[in-house]
Amino acid sequence: MRAPATHIGDVFEIPISDSFKRYMQFVVVDSCQLGGWGIRVFKKDYPLDCNSAIDDILNGEVDFFCLTRAIGHGVLDGLWTKVGKSKDLGDLDKMVFRTYVERVPGILASHWFVWKANHNLKEYKTLPRRYRKVDYGGVMPPSHVVERIRTGRWFKVQNVYDDYDSYLTKWGCERISVPFLRQQRKD
């Protein structure tokens, strides 16, 4: 089956649980990062049975911006469905991304790239404070976008503490708490 055509301005709904959904809008094709398709994801959760007006959705607060490559494949995979279209794309100057390039000895120094959608990259050796909370600029698959909406993280990360508790239970052990030990100085 072929992925449906998507266009700038398309609005999609994303079920995030058995009772809630969120919305996102395709707003730009970013020429700076592999031609990634820029989307803005809105923060408000809506009940699944709610049919909100597109204008009300687009006036809501933006949770995050991201780049993806296959919006149509997200529809095919059942991750989101198209619900409408709007010419209101919001303020694209707020769509700022960052990415880090690791050092390759003798070839490349470590540095940060920061850019606004469809603007030139700026390169920094140290990431300036004003860019520390901007969104990651990698091109993500649709499943990672949904994971970010549901959990606030790009990838599924196991909870180390839950794994530790299950390990202790398996072996019949109890969790112990070790207080912070302060070394006392002898004069």
Walk through the language-model features, giving the residues of each.
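Short N-terminal edge-element motif at the start of the domain
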Residues: 1-47, 52-53
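Intrinsically disordered, low-complexity, charged/polar segments
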Residues: 47-187
